[in-house]
Each structure stands twice: as structure tokens, then as C-alpha cells.
Amino acid sequence: MPQLNPNPWFFIMIISWLTYSMIIQPKILSFTSTNPPARKEPTTNTTTPWNWPWT
């Protein structure tokens, strides 16, 4: 079974992940968020019950 032979694909997978980890990921993480998260207090919704006319 050729899937079990790690020679052709294992090296490519390792090189791909190293490329992602060393080059692409720091560039992506250097961007600042345009909308930084802010701490907000949760609001409770005050709703009035609906009176159905047929009950």
C-alpha cells in the first residue's frame, strides 16, 4: 500500500508546516485587529409576554 510509505509525502508535509510556522504565521499575527475586543457587561432583555387573543 503506497499510503503507508512515508517517503514521498512525509517530507513534503514537514516542509509545508515549517514554511507555514516560520514564514506565513508571523506575518499574519503581526496584523493588528481593526476592532479589538472590549469588555462589555451583559444586558438582560426585558420582554413583555404576548397575549394571544384566542386563549
Swiss-Prot record:
Q: Which UniProt keywords apply?
A: ATP synthesis, CF(0), Hydrogen ion transport, Ion transport, Membrane, Mitochondrion, Transmembrane, Transmembrane helix, Transport
Q: What spans are recorded as compositionally biased (Low complexity)? A: 43-55
Q: Which residues form the signal peptide?
A: none
Keyword Magnesium among UniProt keywords: no
Q: Which InterPro entries match?
A: ATP8_metazoa, ATPase_protein_8
List where the protein spans the membrane.
Answer: 7-24
Chief site of localization: mitochondrion
Tell me which family the UniProt entry assigns to this protein: Belongs to the ATPase protein 8 family.
Report what the protein is called: ATP synthase protein 8
Q: Where is this region: Disordered?
A: 34-55
**Which cellular components does GO assign to this protein?**
mitochondrial membrane; proton-transporting ATP synthase complex
Q: Partners and quaternary state?
A: F-type ATPases have 2 components, CF(1) - the catalytic core - and CF(0) - the membrane proton channel.
Membrane topology per the entry is:
Single-pass membrane protein
Which biological processes are named by the entry's GO terms?
A: proton motive force-driven ATP synthesis
Name of the gene encoding the protein in the UniProt record: MT-ATP8
Where in or outside the cell is it found? Mitochondrion membrane
| A molecular function (GO) term | proton transmembrane transporter activity
**What is the recorded function of this protein according to its Swiss-Prot or TrEMBL entry?**
Mitochondrial membrane ATP synthase (F(1)F(0) ATP synthase or Complex V) produces ATP from ADP in the presence of a proton gradient across the membrane which is generated by electron transport complexes of the respiratory chain. F-type ATPases consist of two structural domains, F(1) - containing the extramembraneous catalytic core and F(0) - containing the membrane proton channel, linked together by a central stalk and a peripheral stalk. During catalysis, ATP synthesis in the catalytic domain of F(1) is coupled via a rotary mechanism of the central stalk subunits to proton translocation.
Pfam families (alphabetical)? ATP-synt_8
- Name the species this protein comes from: Vireo altiloquus (Black-whiskered vireo)
